[in-house]
Amino acid sequence: MKSKAIILLLLAASACSPANISESTEYPPIEPDCTGVTIPEGIAPLNFEMKDGREFKAERTRVGDTIWTKVTAWEKGSDNAVTYAPFPMIVSKDPIDPYIAYRLIEPGYENWHDMGLYQRELASYRETPIATNQINNRGCVNCHNFYASSPDRFLFHARGEGGGTVFVDGDEVKLVNLTKVGTGKQGVYPSWHPGGRYIAFASCKTYQRFSVGDSQPIEVFDETSDIIMMDTATDSTWCIPGLSEAGKLETFPHWSEEGDRLYFCCAEGDTISCEERGNIHYALKSVEFRDGEFSKEVRTVWQCDSASASFPRVNGKWLLFTRSAYGTFPIWHREADLYLMNLETGDVRSVDELNSPDTESYHSWSTNGRWVVFSSRRIDGRYTRLYISHFDGEGHFSKPFLLPQKKYEYNQLRLQSYNVPEFITGKVENRARKYRNLFR
């Protein structure tokens, strides 16, 4: 058993607590709620505040693998205080990757000023840029993807005049315009094959529309979409037979861990109009991949006539995906939730321990498959923030906790959404000068 340690955190403005203290058997009403969560060893402290704004102090005691936090709270200037029942946080033996990469973007509909790809060290509150849109005259920067979660080999899109896909491989940085090689199609939603040579992309013609007086005021949808492959050895691209068919919309490719199967989402239809969007339901499908060739047999993994799947992510026999009422852009769907499939049995369930009344969308597994990071709008319904949960390997997730911040109010002060979180195994080096040289 680890030695017992006591940490006293004075989070109140007053130097001392009131003299009259009563006790409560309830946990303290705090935000974010971190009572009973499971955390990785060495993560930055999970700071919180009282929901009602009262001053407080917190005493944290670690016994073995459990951190107990006792909170005493009082109104400013009052002689009376309440000490709440200590609440636990379980420290897991399963390690977590040291960094998370994501995009930060203002949640506007049409325009943005600043956006960029950033990385957060989980052992601290330190956030550093990977690439911002200052490199390409404030164009769009998005669609980052890492080979095997490596900070030394990855790609991202930098759009606008002279734009393309930026490929990083150690000290080498290059720009490839996918529309000028092979198929002539642009690529989004990249997924790097575990072997390192191939990358699957979706190639989509995307629109957004607004509705007045509708429960869904904005809708983003693909009019057309296919899946294409890139060979990084030759910088060539080609359409995948059976995954770029007329009469179908294919998107969101994702490789299995062994690289022997490609999962993707597919809906029926040549082209889709805004008026038809509510009738479009994407199924989960997969196709075998061996020795650089795809099988002609496409399997249906999951399908529902009244729901749509997106973002399939495989972890051994488990597949985590986002389910929404329809369409292919769940971030604007309040009903969007995370679902888990057992690929061996075919059983599917709503991950109620992670879901909320608001949007849950993009998600990513850690490299050891024991943690998941996902995006949620549960705090205010507008800004997307990141939550982390432990996975026991048997189909169960722990209560999620909000990405720790030095002060909880930072979550309200940051007027940007976290987008496409991905675990990475180390810190990405600063290559800003090399990126800027690509766009001169």
Where are these regions (language model features)?
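Sequence signature of WD/YWTD-type beta-propeller architectures
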Residues: 16-440
